[in-house]
């Protein structure tokens, strides 16, 4: 289980969860931009602030302390492995991270395919130097976003 602050009202049925899973599965098999669906109608008070400042990710530090995540790594998966094309499974060879190469390389402007390719590139070239660069770039992006 990956910890995160709740930023949306809880879905009152499994259909919303299943709808999101299908949305991600469709993205995994397309070249569409990996933008999140609009869920602004379900935001709780402060949810937009937590999301826009990336503070909703802070509880994942618990996962890091438990050894379930790392600070830097591929994006955590939301689907069962069988929902991904075979070539994308390489991204599960590393512990998922709070931030990663995808997040600092254009995040919401990239396709799902580009996200996976960046995750795989990170796995193939990971090093302390790359991790430190990604962490520094993440901090810069979060602070810059907070000043807008």
Where are these regions (language model features)?
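Conserved small/aromatic sequence motifs within transmembrane helices
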Residues: 1-148
């Amino acid at each position: 289980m990956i910890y995160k602050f709740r930023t949306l009202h809880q879905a009152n049925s499994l259909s919303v969860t299943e709808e999101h899973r299908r949305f991600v599965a469709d993205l995994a098999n397309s070249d569409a931009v990996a933008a999140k669906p609009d869920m602004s109608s379900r935001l709780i008070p402060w949810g937009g602030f937590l999301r826009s400042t990336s503070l909703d990710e802070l509880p994942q530090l618990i996962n890091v302390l438990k050894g379930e995540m790392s600070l830097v790594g591929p994006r955590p998966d939301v689907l069962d492995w069988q929902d991904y094309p075979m070539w994308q499974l390489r991204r599960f060879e590393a512990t998922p991270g709070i931030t990663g190469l995808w997040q600092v390389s254009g995040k919401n402007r990239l396709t799902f395919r580009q996200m996976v390719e960046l995750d795989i590139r990170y796995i193939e070239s990971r090093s302390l130097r790359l991790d430190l660069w990604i962490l520094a770039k993440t901090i810069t992006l979060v602070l810059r976003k907070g000043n807008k």
